[in-house]
Swiss-Prot record:
Residue intervals of the C-type lysozyme domain: 19-148
Keyword vocabulary terms for this entry: Antimicrobial, Bacteriolytic enzyme, Disulfide bond, Glycosidase, Hydrolase, Secreted, Signal
Pfam families linked: Lys
Something else known: Lysozyme C is capable of both hydrolysis and transglycosylation; it also shows a slight esterase activity. It acts rapidly on both peptide-substituted and unsubstituted peptidoglycan, and slowly on chitin oligosaccharides.
Protein's organism: Saguinus oedipus (Cotton-top tamarin)
Family: Belongs to the glycosyl hydrolase 22 family.
Gene Ontology CC terms, in alphabetical order: extracellular region
BP terms from Gene Ontology: defense response to Gram-negative bacterium; defense response to Gram-positive bacterium; killing of cells of another organism
Catalysed reactions, semicolon-separated: Hydrolysis of (1->4)-beta-linkages between N-acetylmuramic acid and N-acetyl-D-glucosamine residues in a peptidoglycan and between N-acetyl-D-glucosamine residues in chitodextrins
Protein name: Lysozyme C
Length: 148
């Protein structure tokens, strides 16, 4: 019985952790999903963004007490503007999706929402981590050796 409980806890922790992409695996996935060059943004910039926002973790979340919003998923997309979590006051939900969709191992919906974000006037500058860690920097290291 103890073994079954322990096994259940281990499986639960794996399910909660989500998928943490390997760097080149994510680069290939983002390229396949059409992010390389989307709105003039290089694949290396998207990779830098994902590294600094979530460390390539699909289940990453970050609560923002100021506006009571939460950032979700590999791109840390915010519930105040882009998705609906049912808890953020005055949420816009411009991507027309549940925030939980941004936490899936299959990042297709997260990529579609990220594309929606960069269509706004701020573009990729909407992400603070991109401005702090990627803007005006050599970001080639994020795709180096990946063959993309």
């Amino acid at each position: 019985m103890k073994v079954l409980i322990l096994l259940g806890l281990v499986l639960l922790s794996v399910m909660v952790q989500g998928k943490v992409f390997e760097r080149c695996e994510l680069a290939r996935t983002l390229k396949r999903l059409g992010l390389d060059g989307y709105r003039g943004i290089s694949l290396a910039n998207w990779m830098c963004l994902a590294k600094w926002e979530s460390d390539y973790n699909t289940r990453a979340t970050n609560y923002n007490p100021g506006d009571q919003s939460t950032d979700y998923g590999i791109f840390q997309i915010n519930s105040h503007y882009w998705c609906n979590n049912g808890r953020t006051p005055g949420a816009v939900n411009a991507c027309h999706i549940s925030c939980n969709a941004l936490l899936q191992d299959d990042i297709t919906e997260a990529v579609a929402c990220a594309k929606r974000v960069v269509r706004d006037p701020q573009g990729i500058r909407a992400w603070v981590a991109w401005k702090a860690h990627c803007q005006n920097r050599d970001v080639s290291q994020y795709i180096q050796g990946c063959g993309v």
